[in-house]
Amino acid sequence: MNEKVRIGYPPSRVWGCPTTAMWVYRLGAEKAKQMLFTGDLISGTKAEEIGLIFQSVPLEELDATVNQLTNRIKGVPKNQLMMMKMMVNQAYENMGLANTQTIATLFDGMARHSPEGIWFKQRAEEVGFKQAIAERDSGDPIQGSKK
């Protein structure tokens, strides 16, 4: 990932829940809560530092870095790659990934149909999506939310 890219999940402030739930598995509970409770964006450098991504590099090095990694991986026999992928995926399944993703999908739908979610949709219709996003991501309290 480019070190200057910003990554996060701003819809966690209102109108969404990340359905993959990978934040918890990649970051642990505390950092995942911080990211999701605030909806803040972080740089690629910070994302690497906290373990959200594998590596961040300057934009001008991105293609070469990706090519180097893919060339390294493609030298491994396919059956070996398949077994390693299945083993890692099974470990996530054993930790409850599928169940977590199911409930996250339900919560995503609920978030979009909550009073705050409905307010956000109506606000976007009134002022346009770009302005509604700017208001949501400003850090100010969400209108109509129950505190």
Regions found by a protein language model. Name each.
Residues 1-35, 65, 69:
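CoA-thioester-processing core
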Residues 1-5, 12, 54-102:
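C-terminal long alpha-helix characteristic of the crotonase
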Residues 18, 42-43, 61:
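Short Gly/charged-rich anion-binding patches and loops
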Residues 26, 41, 56:
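Short aromatic/basic micro-patch
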Residues 26, 38, 75:
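Conserved catalytic core of Hanks-type protein kinase domains
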Residues 43-44, 75-147:
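C-terminal alpha-helix plus adjacent terminal tail
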Residues 50-51:
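Structural motif
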